[in-house]
Amino acid sequence: MAGIVTEPWSVAENGNPSITAKGSSRELRLGRTAHNMSSSSLRKKSDLRVIQKVPYKGLKDFLSNLQEVILGTKLAILFPAIPAAIICTYCGVSQPWIFGLSLLGLTPLAERVSFLTEQLAFYTGPTLGGLLNATCGNATELIIAILALTNNKVAVVKYSLLGSILSNLLLVLGTSLFCGGIANIRREQRFDRKQADVNFFLLLLGFLCHLLPLLVGYLKNGEASAAVLSDMQLSISRGFSIVMLISYIAYLVFQLWTHRQLFDAQEQEDEYDDDVEQETAVISFWSGFAWLVGMTLVIALLSEYVVATIEEASDKWNLSVSFISIILLPIVGNAAEHAGAVIFAFKNKLDISLGVALGSATQIGLFVVPLTIIVAWILGINMDLNFGPLETGCLAVSIIITAFTLQDGSSHYMKGLVLLLCYFIIAICFFVDKLPQKQNAIHLGHQAMNNVVTATGGGVFSS
């Protein structure tokens, strides 16, 4: 690997490296995933002229880090929602307010995690950096799923993960194709089908793993008791989850090592690409690592608030838990990534937009979902891959219609419009789901915990 140095980790803060980071600029670009390319469109350059005049190096480094990490994004305006959610918790404010503020606070945090993993990739090299980016790409969804699981809210876990897949396949991709088609209405937008084909093969594998446990419950009904059927579905799901994780590991090897060229973001010589080419690390390795740990802890805190208040928000807003989990959580939680995908579609860079939507859907379907099943298994919680007939049907239709939409390697606004309309149809279906809260929480086959109390200072959540 070109440009490797033997000196220990160190770099002067804010883009003035004292040594050469691992990998050349070209190699570092290869280590970036579509998630990072998408999120980078929401970043803004920092003006550090005032900070550079601070005489004390420690204070100057801290202020520089603060400027780059907190204020270096166009979503910085949403950061006040984080302390607001915490204060509302201590003051005993209505839980729907805490739920809404926590969701808003998660939006910039998800984008900043992407920024920090990219900063670390400057030091780890393109391969390890790409692996880090791929692993942390959906950290918010994984944290919410695990916290909901520890509260025994299995339905919320299933709904939120399914919603993330549907959102990426229909909403994000549909909006990107529609906006890109309108912005480039006088010319045909084209993209490389190869990476899309790989993602669809894996998504179909994931769908098969969801379909078979569902069919077992129907085909074996009457031949065995409900308890036996439940055990069969649980055992099948755990076995399938191991297979899904193996397939995801193979996908990472395929993406980062053997066929990396298929997943490279398209490289056109324009102003944006020149900017990307000149990017350097703006914070040191250990500063980036510390910020990443801190951001992850804050995401975990806000995710706990979201999980603990979702039923109360459902009652107050007269919305079903299924609608909030499948529609609202993915839209707000991934707003930064979604906006970036649309921006690149406007720039006629559909390969990046596709990489965001399909890559994220694949990661959730083949990594986050089976990992959640394994974690539930370890915790002694019965969670399977049977998401229900309606939910599994929505997943199947979404994968099939998206595959047909992208089969010819070209795009126009009508394709995006159809995907968006499909998403609206699914949203309407879950919007009219008015099952009572307790039934809504258990209708996927698992009894929710009757009383989950989370005490954080003066704030107490009950569900």
Curated annotation (Swiss-Prot):
Listed result of changing residue 32 to A: Loss of autoinhibitory regulation
Entries under Gene3D superfamilies matching the protein: NCX, central ion-binding region (1.20.1420.30)
Sites bearing N-acetylalanine, chain numbering: 2
pH dependence per the entry: Optimum pH is 7.5 for cytosolic pH.
Residues bearing carbohydrate: 318
Upregulation: By cold in leaves. Highly induced by Ca(2+) and at low levels by Na(+) and Ni(2+).
Gene deletion effect: Plants exhibit a 50% reduction in tonoplast Ca(2+)/H(+) exchange activity, a 40% reduction in tonoplast V-type H(+)-translocating ATPase activity, a 36% increase in tonoplast Ca(2+)-ATPase activity and an increased expression of CAX3 and CAX4. These plants exhibit altered plant development, perturbed hormone sensitivities, altered auxin signaling response, lower sensitivity to other metal ions and increased freezing tolerance after cold acclimation.
Location in the cell: Vacuole membrane
GO cellular-component term (any): plant-type vacuole
Effect of residue 446 to A: No effect on transport activity
Activity regulation note: Activated by monothiol glutaredoxin GRXS14 and CXIP4. Inhibited by excess of Ca(2+) and Cd(2+), Na(+) and K(+), but not Mn(2+).
Presence of the UniProt keyword Chaperone in the record: no
Stated consequence of mutating residue 412 to A: No effect on transport activity
Keyword annotations from UniProtKB, A to Z: Acetylation, Antiport, Calcium, Calcium transport, Glycoprotein, Ion transport, Membrane, Transmembrane, Transmembrane helix, Transport, Vacuole
PANTHER family in the record: VACUOLAR CALCIUM ION TRANSPORTER (PTHR31503), VACUOLAR CATION_PROTON EXCHANGER 1 (PTHR31503:SF43)
Record-stated family: Belongs to the Ca(2+):cation antiporter (CaCA) (TC 2.A.19) family. Cation/proton exchanger (CAX) subfamily.
Function of the protein: Vacuolar cation/proton exchanger (CAX). Translocates Ca(2+) and other metal ions into vacuoles using the proton gradient formed by H(+)-ATPase and H(+)-pyrophosphatase. Involved in ion homeostasis in association with CAX3. May play a role in cold-acclimation response.
Subunit structure: Interacts with GRXS14 and CXIP4.
Protein name: Vacuolar cation/proton exchanger 1
Organism field: Arabidopsis thaliana (Mouse-ear cress)
